[in-house]
């Protein structure tokens, strides 16, 4: 299942999670935390009442068995506490995408949110911050692989079992490299950088693909490797929007290239 926000443009959020689960032939469930829209040209988030989030989680817990959980945007401190309580009764794979910064806006979350989010780390099999989020969590700048490794160590020290820092386009060079660290081993996953603007939802899709792969029995390293390729194909085959941006999308291409 995914516990995440709803993206009205369906590039990221629970919409991309469900599409990813479907590509991996898994039945996806949702608990919605908030709704993201574009209002007067500005990115805006409306929270759902925390009681409603709790009701959604209880509905799932009382009626279904879960094989894996992906955590996305959990916008309120009270919601983080509700989710933490829910995770205590689950012992399967959990992938946490620690959403703290957005491409669409300069908004970032405050220290109180950071501290509450960190309380979820021990429950997660792996967390998947982008560079900005890794900087916020580790409280250091990241401008090269050495600093990325330093940040990964600090994130593990916060209680994470393992972390994948998504390098994206920001670091120099021709490769988009993600760094995996589990307190023992560093491993890079790299693909050639793409110039495509169809990147909305890449982070959400990456995390939900890892969750899907773990549910299907892959070990964590192979799950990350497969998910990296899956997202790469989604960016290559993405859907352009009227505003000049675009969503990750796969069509029929990804199933033949990745799902074999």
What do the PLM-derived regions correspond to, one by one?
Residues 47, 222-260:
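Charged C-terminal helix
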Residues 110-185:
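Conserved phosphate/ATP/ADP-binding segment of small-molecule kinases
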Residues 1-15, 208:
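N-terminal beta1-alpha1 ligand-phosphate binding loop
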Residues 25-29, 187, 213-227:
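Phosphate-handling active-site elements
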Residues 15, 136, 196-220:
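Short, small-residue alpha-helix embedded
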Residues 4-9, 186-200:
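Short pre-catalytic strand/loop immediately N-terminal to key active-site residues, enriched for Gly-Thr
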Residues 1-2, 16-103, 253-257:
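Conserved N-terminal subdomain of the carbohydrate kinase-like
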């Amino acid at each position: 299942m995914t516990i995440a926000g709803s993206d009205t443009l369906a590039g990221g959020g629970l919409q991309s999670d469900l599409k990813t689960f479907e590509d991996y032939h898994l039945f996806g469930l949702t608990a919605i935390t908030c709704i993201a829209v574009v209002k007067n040209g500005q990115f805006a988030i409306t929270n759902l009442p925390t009681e409603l989030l709790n009701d959604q989680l209880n509905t799932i817990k009382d009626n279904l068995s879960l094989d894996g959980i992906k955590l996305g945007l959990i916008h309120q401190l009270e919601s983080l506490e509700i989710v933490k309580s829910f995770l205590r009764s689950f012992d399967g794979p959990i992938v946490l995408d620690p959403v703290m910064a957005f491409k669409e806006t300069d908004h970032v979350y405050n220290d109180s949110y950071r501290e509450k989010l960190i309380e979820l780390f021990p429950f997660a099999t792996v967390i998947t911050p982008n560079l900005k989020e890794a900087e916020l969590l580790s409280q250091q700048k990241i401008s090269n692989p050495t600093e990325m490794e330093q940040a990964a160590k600090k994130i593990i020290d916060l209680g994470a079992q393992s972390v994948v820092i998504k390098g994206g386009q920001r670091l120099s060079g021709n490769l988009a490299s993600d760094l995996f660290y589990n307190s023992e081993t560093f491993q890079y996953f790299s693909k050639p950088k793409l110039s495509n603007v169809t990147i909305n939802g890449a982070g959400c899709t990456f995390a939900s693909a890892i969750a899907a792969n773990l549910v299907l029995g892959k070990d964590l390293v192979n799950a990350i490797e497969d998910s990296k390729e899956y997202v790469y194909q989604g960016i290559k085959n993405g859907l352009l929007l009227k505003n000049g941006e675009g969503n990750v999308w796969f069509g029929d291409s990804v199933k033949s290239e990745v799902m074999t």
